A protein has these predicted regions:
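C-terminal flanking tails of non-heme Fe-dependent oxygenases
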Residues: 1-156
Length: 156
């Protein structure tokens, strides 16, 4: 991958989720709705505030990911899933609002979103190619990101 990430277009984001008054929250409302990350990998450092990160497991259930001192959460992104023909799965995740009985809480996280070089070609790696040969067509990382941004903008 070295030649595909030596000019990466990554981003570091400081995420602040302010306290939400329970009376202003609709049933089932989330701080961040279910989504996957677009790039290759995401490294997340989260605080231990209630109402945190949840991931959807292979059992289709949502599982809380507790913050652990000194630990980072590593999420596989859509680009890496495409490079591996799904052998490594992109992580569907969301951020919950704390329950009303947990008191007032803000949430702070730091996320590093790693993306490949804008012109890197995302094409299924040979060892990951399925026996039936069916794979997504090659795409540049830049086009992949733009397609994902536009898809999100359209609400897809």
């Amino acid at each position: 991958f070295a030649s595909s990430i030596d000019r990466h277009t990554s981003a570091l984001r400081l995420l602040h989720y302010p306290h939400v008054e329970p009376s202003s929250v609709a049933s089932g409302q989330l701080r961040a709705g279910a989504h996957s990350d677009y790039g290759t990998l995401t490294l997340l450092r989260q605080d231990d505030a209630p109402g945190g990160l949840e991931v959807r497991g292979a059992d289709d259930e949502w599982h809380q990911i507790p913050a652990e001192e000194g630990a980072y959460v590593v999420n596989i992104g859509d680009a890496l899933e495409r490079w591996t023909a799904g052998r490594w799965r992109s992580t569907l995740h969301r951020v919950q609002i704390p329950s009303p009985d947990s008191g007032p809480h803000e949430r702070q996280s730091i996320a590093f979103f790693h993306n490949a070089n804008w012109d890197a070609v995302i094409e299924v790696l040979g060892p990951c190619r399925p026996s039936d040969g069916e794979v997504a067509p090659p795409i540049t990382a830049g086009r992949h990101l733009m397609e994902r941004f536009l898809s999100t903008q359209r609400g897809e």
